[in-house]
Amino acid sequence: MNLDEFSDFNIDQLLGPSAPLQDALVAPYKQVSLPRSNQDVYAKRSRLAERIAQNDELIRQVKQLQAQNKQLADLQRTAQEVTDLYQKEKQQRIELEKRTKQIGERCGQLEKELDVQVGNCENLQEQLQVRGLPVEAKDVLSILMQFSQRLGDDCGLLRRDQNIMKKLREHCKTIDVSVPTPKSPNSRSKRKAHQPGVNQSTQTDEEPADPKPALCSVAVQVEGLIETRNQATQHKNTTTTRGTTTASFIKHHDVGTCFPEPKPLPNIRQILDEMLSWRDDVVIEPMSPLSDLQQELQLEDVPTNASVATCTTLCDIHREIDFVTDLPTQIKVSASRPPSRTMLDSVKEEARSSRELAKELFNFLPQNQSCLTNLPPQAFEELWQVFGQMVLALLQRRSNPSMATPPSVSQADFTRWLYELYEGTENQTEQTSNGSTSKRDFATSTECMDTGTDPIIQSPNISHEGHVTPIRLPSKPKERKRKSKKRKAAATPKPIAKRKCLEMETNNELEVEREQTPETAIQFLSNLETFNMANCDNLEMELDEEELYLLQLTSNAKQNENKGNVRVQDPDDLKSPAQTSKFPKSENHLPAVLKETASSLKGYDEKQCPFPDKTEELMHKKTFEIQENIGSLTELPPNIDISAYPVSMAEVRIVSSNKPSEMEVNASEGTDSHLDKSVSNLDTGSMSLFGSDSDVESEYSIEQMAPELSDSDDTFDNSEEDCRSADEPSNSKKIRNSSLFGSESESDESEERALEADDLTEAEAKVEEKESEQKSSDVAPAASSGKLLVVEADLVTKTQPLFVEKLDLENTQHTSTCTNPKETDESEDEHGLVIDEQIFISQPEEPPLTVPIAAKRRRTQSELKTLSPPGEVRLTRQRAKQLLDEQKSGPEKGLSLVEQIRRQLKKAINKSEPFKKDSTHDSKKDSTHDLKPLEHEDELKAMQLGTNFEPIKLSCSISEESPASPPACEPMDELDPPPIEIPLEQAACTRKDDQHKSIVQHVLKMDTGLEKLVEANRKTLGKSQPQLCASIGKYLQENMQLESTCSDLAMDIYKVTKSEAVIVNAMITVICKIGLDDGPVERLLNALKYLNFSQRFLAELEERLFRNTKERPATELALNYVRLYLKATALQATMSAGYENPARLLLAKILYHFDQDMPPLVMEVLRQFPTALPHREQREYDNSDALITVIKHLLMNRQYDMQDPNGAERLLLSKLRFEYHFQPYEPSKQQVLENLVGKLKAGREEELGYAFALFCRRSPHLKVVESVVGEHLMPLATSYCDLAAQNELYDARLGLLLHCISLVLKPLPLDTDISAFVGFLKRLLVAVPRSGVQLAAVKASLRLQRFGFKYTLDALKDYRPNYELDPLTRAMIRCFAKRRRHFRHVAATGRRTEI
């Protein structure tokens, strides 16, 4: 390249430093000719190229700045135009407002003027009506007179018209009106008036007709045999009320009328008698002869006054008792005492007055009702009196449990008295009634009683001068009649049982045993004490061949022992139904008392059999309990003699009642039947009351099931502690939003374990002590005649039932210290064991001893505890331990459990001597269990108390003379006491242990035995915590994001711990230290998604934000929590469907819990989720959520600090005003309240409780108790309560309303008076027995415990549910008991412990 061409350029100067630009222009330079220099031309060229490139870049930037400057100028101009337009529009609006105001004032003036003009117009119209007449009044008179003169005098006016004309003339003279002179008469103008003609008619008599002879058809017309009744008949209505038995009388009064009474049609014999009685000389006349009309009109009008007098001192009568109403009515409870002490302590449910219950109650009545018909009048009067007393006691039992007293007469005495009363007067001759009597029931008169008898009329009055005649019992019972075979077969069909027993008796003897006495209403009432159940469908117990044989074996124990010729069948034929049958889960959960009664009734008879019989599986419901109890023989130890444990449960009850300090052994003495129902439903997956209620178990794995079994069995060795520690990770997934502002309860699993351990330790210690006492005692144990009394209420602490389908001991594993569920059963529902104590059986060989009747123990309500539902076989803890020991050291472990039991029973049958010696020997020899007899223990306790208790013969669940009981071994003459009076009023004194404890009292009692409180769930690991945080921090700071990194993180974390709570807590701590950059947060969300921890992550963030009410987190830390929450919320929304607007709910919680730091947190939520609140112009937005109105009201009625231009409060208000276009102070609190109440009345449940709570807590200048609760919520609750008492359509709304009221009252000051609401809750628990309303009322009362535990205890003292509680209610009750125990501990020691 030739450089001569560039001689005019100074290259050195071009490559030198450039001069600074001035106004983005390059300064010109002068060309100077320089000598040519030999330099590096290529280097200069490159520098020149770089300088040119820089210049081009500068030129481009200049152009870009010029374009931006132009845009900025345009924007400024546009902004100025917008500002001018805004000012112009504002000025126009001000002018328009002024003009509008002026126009409005002008309109007001015009309206006033218009009113004046309207009034004037109306006056003018009235004047026009007066003045607009054609002539004046004076002229009218003259014109009228002129017209009369023109007509003339002979115009045919009537006398009335002439009198009027005369009066007009006189009036004209009076007022000086000139009357024109009459004109001359004109003959042509006269008109003749029409004269009325006279009509004449004659009336003649009708032509007389020949009389016709009276005819009648002999074959058709007969005299109706209708007896008439005079209304003067005396009627008597005996009414039994609470406290009094009264009789009301209607006095004789004659109303002068007789009316026919409906009678059945005459039979053929009566018609023939009437026809043959006719004679020729008798003139047959019609039945209704023609009567004269005048005679009928002249009948006397006899007054129909009735004089009614009632001789009574009624005591609070609220309802008729001699009929069942069609519709259920509200039962008003009286404070008066019940009328009789013969009522039953075991009655705990109020009789429901519904048609369905009436049908069930009266199913026991025979169809022909011949028994009641044949009763003589006096017997009917006394029985009707007793019936009223019993029904009233049923109605009073639930409402006034403190008035219950023990019955003064036993059930057997009452039964004997009834049969004596019935049979003693059965053969009396029936008297015919007079013509004025009638039957009570026209429809069934031909079936129920003979014609012409009325037992009510013939019976004497039971009331003498206002005093009630007492009922005296006879000294000895008479022989009862047996029910015929034909009638029994027609009454109740029974299932065909294909069973074989050992050497049964002849069929004739079996037929005698199977005969039963007719079941009547009186027998049903006498057995109410035993059959304490809501549904009485199976009252008439039918026994099949096997059951009858079992009863016969028991009753003839001595005879079998003396004969010694009992043959044993082949062992292959002895198959237990528990081995061959599968028990289906019962979906029809019967009431607790029904299940207990049915099970004890049949199990009592069957467990007396020395061995199980071969039976085929029967799935029918009536025999299902029999199969269950036969299968329950598998609960007995396989290597223990069946007679080793004789015990009299009566003595156990008497001793336990005299020594209250031993009640801790029987931990569930006061447990109500509802508690077993509330924890027995395994299908729902819910845990027991003291289980983990706030945690949701995702699946039942081997890791989770083994600790549960080990927790239940506290008699194992100390190695089970490892299993308990492994149970902590199971508390993983908390239910989100279980309460609005924090959790209602904490998990309390170790509390149950400690309680069960204490109970079992005390029980074992006492049993061991009594074994040593038994060895030193020479008194031979005496038992009743083979009556097995397994009263679970005395010896049972209930947890979850265990379904047993088949026991297989060959598959057990001996290496595990914590038993696997497969070791005890192979069923699907494997949970904890049920019974904490041993099961004792009585010795069936010894004869019963006679005792006075006063020593008989009555059946207390605490015995009425529920057994397993049909199809469930439950194992005791003692039995579980025996199974485990048998696996280790049992010599017969190769055999099945049923086969071992069968061999033991065969040995017991073949023995010819009593089992007492062998039982003592076996109990000493067997070291694997601690089953000991209790009779020596009872005798020693009786000696210490100075009382000698003898074995008592009891009726377990039926009367001693009922058809299903075995025949007595000895005559009952020695047991007959002198006649006992049955008083008609109860005494005021009651035993404390006769009453059911409420569920709250039971929970409090169960908690009293714990010495230490449950420590809080730990969320850190201690020494391993840094390692866990390092693993998480390393993962969050990695640059590479792969799927494998999440799996590596999971492996590293699970090496340290598997606790979800610990891992999530560490994640939050680490991410807050690292910072919320996009990379770490994204990796954290990926890890949460991979580990499926997002739900726990949100719960932990909420706990850190809102749980600690005294110390809130700092503003920056709270902002980090909110940002993380919103990120995780977006992740959760993508993972789960139906997750609607969680940001709005977070916004409500922030407003509820934060006051000073609220603006930055709300600002952060609205930045990330701007759709949490709607814009004012956004019409398509869903505004149905009640939280929207409340949040807008709270945000726009707050006083903001506008001093700091960059402050969060100023920015938040600007965002609300200019982005969402919210108006200041809108909506008002009245509008919000009306909106919330309207949604409540409409039944919309979307976050309504949250909205009420937030509104009443943060709304300024709001009178919560007076305006919100007093004026709106409580009246609405009262009306809903009345509606819910009638039907269940308003249950959901009433429950929601109680939820809202409790959340509103919860944060109020402690001096607030809430007694009115607590009283309403008490009324509601009684008035509405349905579970939905009652659970809402219970939760509402538990939320108000911060005002004092007395309010909650007072509201729930009578709450005894018979349904299963939901997990939240159980958790709240457990938390209430824990807090109460905590504060009592603080009050006693002065030291605070962590709850």
Curated annotation (Swiss-Prot):
Keywords, A to Z, come to:
Coiled coil, Nucleus, Transcription, Transcription regulation
Annotated signal sequence range: none
* Bias (Basic and acidic residues) ranges: 721-731, 763-776, 913-936
Chain intervals for the UniProt region annotation (Disordered): 175-212, 452-496, 561-588, 658-680, 707-786, 841-872, 908-936
Location comes to: Nucleus
Q: Which segments show compositional bias classed as Basic residues?
A: 478-489
A GO BP term here is:
snRNA transcription by RNA polymerase II
Q: Which GO terms describe its cellular component?
A: euchromatin; super elongation complex; transcription elongation factor complex
Q: Any stretches that span the bilayer, and where are they?
A: none
Q: Which residues form a coiled coil?
A: 748-778
Any GO molecular function: chromatin binding
Give me the stretches of Acidic residues compositional bias: 710-720, 745-762
Tell me, what does this protein do in biology? Answer: Component of the little elongation complex (LEC), a complex required to regulate small nuclear RNA (snRNA) gene transcription by RNA polymerase II and III. Specifically acts as a scaffold protein that promotes the LEC complex formation and recruitment and RNA polymerase II occupancy at snRNA genes in subnuclear bodies.
Q: Summarize subunit and interaction data from the UniProt record for this chain.
A: Component of the little elongation complex (LEC), at least composed of Ell, Eaf, Ice1 and Ice2.
Family, according to the entry, reads as follows: Belongs to the ICE1 family.
Q: What is this protein called?
A: Little elongation complex subunit 1
**Organism in which the protein naturally occurs:** Drosophila melanogaster
